[in-house]
């Protein structure tokens, strides 16, 4: 029996986001009617994404339809997030999948001297846990919050909280995409908005780990499954601006070398990186797969993909949850009069 399912994928225009959509379409029941809600900050990127997804759908056999919708949302703008909530609530009565693929950073370049030293002293570590990416410190959004904190953590969390009725109606699954680089060392609990951090991107992914750990049980009580994943290491389009043709292919060579000498995390292709996020959404058995674990996309030396799980150090999760919950209440109050009656259908 066919069903109608709705999937919202944030950051759809990224390498990982597109491949999450591809794999989701592949792994869904062929008779299901799917609606893919593409999200981006700009309309041209939305159109580009939808064209790519349509081309992919034309290469596979399925009896169910694939429909396309879009959502223009900027997770560093709370009014935009609230507008996204109203837009989705007006269009849909349920959401089945919500992928949090937010991955904004404030990079300013590469410490090339440091990179060369790392590559020669420890090549595997250099392409697994690099320390030579330069990130700006103290960058705030127009809302006055830490930009990376808002884009990758608080903004998506706020939207999910607003969409709980739709997720409940769809017996939905929320999939947080974290990172292999989300160790406790990247976050100070005295700097939850990451304004004093020179590793704000990694710190935001540590916050994702802790926020998931603090909330998945409550989500389960609502009939919503929530999983924590990471894509391993792959070629990300966002960092290409800092590479030339030589450094790009040098990076690829080191990625393949790392995989050959035994790293499970060098998936390299975005398609393989999307394995874990789509696996937990479509194939995970809620009676077997534990929501407190972190599910990673992994590959063997020959490129054969598999799922690798890790435990999460939850130290500080209640502190993070308390801080973000209080911040949500503050923004509820600030935004209560932002949506005008003209937005409500007559």
Swiss-Prot record:
SUPFAM superfamilies hit by this protein: NAD(P)-binding Rossmann-fold domains
This protein's UniProt keywords: Lipid biosynthesis, Lipid metabolism, NADP, Oxidoreductase, Steroid biosynthesis
InterPro entries according to UniProt: Ergosterol_Biosynth_ERG27, NAD(P)-bd_dom_sf, SDR_fam
Record EC number: 1.1.1.270
Top-rank EC class of the record's enzyme: oxidoreductase
GO biological process, one term: ergosterol biosynthetic process
Pathway assignment: Steroid biosynthesis; zymosterol biosynthesis; zymosterol from lanosterol: step 5/6
Superkingdom of origin: Eukaryota
Reactions performed catalytically: a 3beta-hydroxysteroid + NADP(+) = a 3-oxosteroid + NADPH + H(+)
Any matching Pfam family: adh_short
Gene Ontology CC: one annotated term: endoplasmic reticulum membrane
Presence of keyword NADP: yes
Name of the protein described by the UniProt record: 3-keto-steroid reductase
Organism whose genome encodes this protein: Kluyveromyces lactis (strain ATCC 8585 / CBS 2359 / DSM 70799 / NBRC 1267 / NRRL Y-1140 / WM37)
């Amino acid at each position: 029996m066919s069903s109608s399912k709705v999937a919202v994928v944030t950051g759809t225009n990224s390498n990982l986001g597109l491949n999450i959509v591809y794999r989701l379409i592949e792994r869904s029941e062929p008779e299901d009617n799917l609606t893919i809600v593409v999200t981006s900050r700009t309309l041209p990127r939305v159109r580009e994404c939808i064209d790519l997804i349509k081309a992919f759908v034309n290469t596979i056999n399925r009896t169910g339809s694939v429909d396309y919708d879009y959502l223009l949302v900027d997770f560093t703008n709370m009014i935009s997030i609230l507008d996204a909530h109203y837009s989705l609530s007006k269009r849909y009565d349920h959401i089945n999948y919500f992928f949090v693929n937010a991955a904004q950073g404030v990079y300013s370049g590469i410490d090339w001297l440091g990179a060369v030293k790392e590559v020669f002293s420890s090549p595997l570590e250099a392409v697994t846990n690099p320390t030579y990416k330069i990130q700006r410190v103290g960058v705030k959004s127009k809302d006055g919050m830490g930009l990376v904190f808002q884009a990758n953590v608080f903004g998506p969390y706020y939207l999910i909280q607003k969409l709980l009725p739709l997720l409940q109606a769809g017996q939905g699954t929320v999939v947080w995409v974290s990172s292999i680089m989300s160790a406790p060392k990247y976050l100070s609990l005295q700097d939850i908005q990451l304004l004093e951090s020179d590793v704000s991107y990694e710190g935001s992914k540590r916050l994702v780990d802790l926020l998931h750990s603090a909330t998945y049980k409550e989500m389960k009580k609502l009939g919503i499954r929530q999983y924590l994943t990471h894509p391993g290491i792959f070629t990300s389009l966002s960092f290409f601006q800092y590479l030339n043709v030589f450094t790009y292919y040098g990076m690829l060579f080191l990625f393949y070398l790392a995989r050959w000498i035994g790293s499970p995390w060098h998936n390299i292709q975005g398609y393989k990186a999307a394995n874990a996020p789509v696996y937990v959404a479509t194939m995970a058995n809620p009676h077997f797969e534990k929501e407190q674990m972190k599910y990673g996309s992994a590959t063997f030396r020959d490129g054969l993909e598999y799922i690798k799980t890790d435990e999460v150090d939850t130290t500080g999760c209640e502190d993070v949850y308390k801080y973000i919950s209080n911040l949500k209440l503050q923004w509820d109050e600030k935004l209560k009069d932002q949506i005008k009656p003209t937005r409500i259908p007559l």
